[in-house]
Amino acid sequence: EMSASLVGSEMCIRDRDYVLEGNLNYTGAVITWLKDDLKLISSAKETEGLAREANPADRTYLVPAFTGLGAPYWDEKATASISGITRTTGKAEVVKAALDCIAYQITDLVRAMEQDTGMRIEELRVDGGPTRNGYLMQFQSDITNKRVNIPDAEELSGIGAAYMAGISAGVYDLEKLAGNMKRSVYEPKMDDEIREKKYAGWKKAVDGVLSK
């Protein structure tokens, strides 16, 4: 499971490709925390079902600043928190908040990149173990208001390295490889007002853990 995530936005300047990179300290590892430390789940696969069972009106936010916060906050002294808990908040709601915080952090990066570059990101192309979680991928699409494009292969880094080696050796043809990957697509379905209200709640939760 991932302990960190990278979000990259590609720009082409003078026939060269540049990648604007953003690093997150805690994404998939928050699920490991739920399993190993809180004992709320026995496997990551349980999280999707629990998230779907959670009360949709619950406003619990989990900020996983266990080792501070990375981009775009860069606050190594920030501390983790769970806020917005009510009497009806239970295991399902906490698990849902843990999944949601992954999507919120990526949304922070996407919005920062769009603001810094003046370029709109139309689509997120994602990989890694959490992409198998349908609830998380739909929420990621909803909260960013972006199409989320997921390859059938979970770990693209290894595949990409093999493809590059094969292309360099003349074994593979780039054009043919480009059409080999099958993908699933999630489209945003959330109302704009609801999206901004949820994201504002996340920003308020983050503000509460920042050291400065």
In which residue ranges do the predicted regions lie?
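Glycine/Thr-rich phosphate-binding loops that ligate phosphate moieties of nucleotide
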Residues: 9-10, 14-212
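Positively charged, low-complexity/disordered segments
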Residues: 1-8
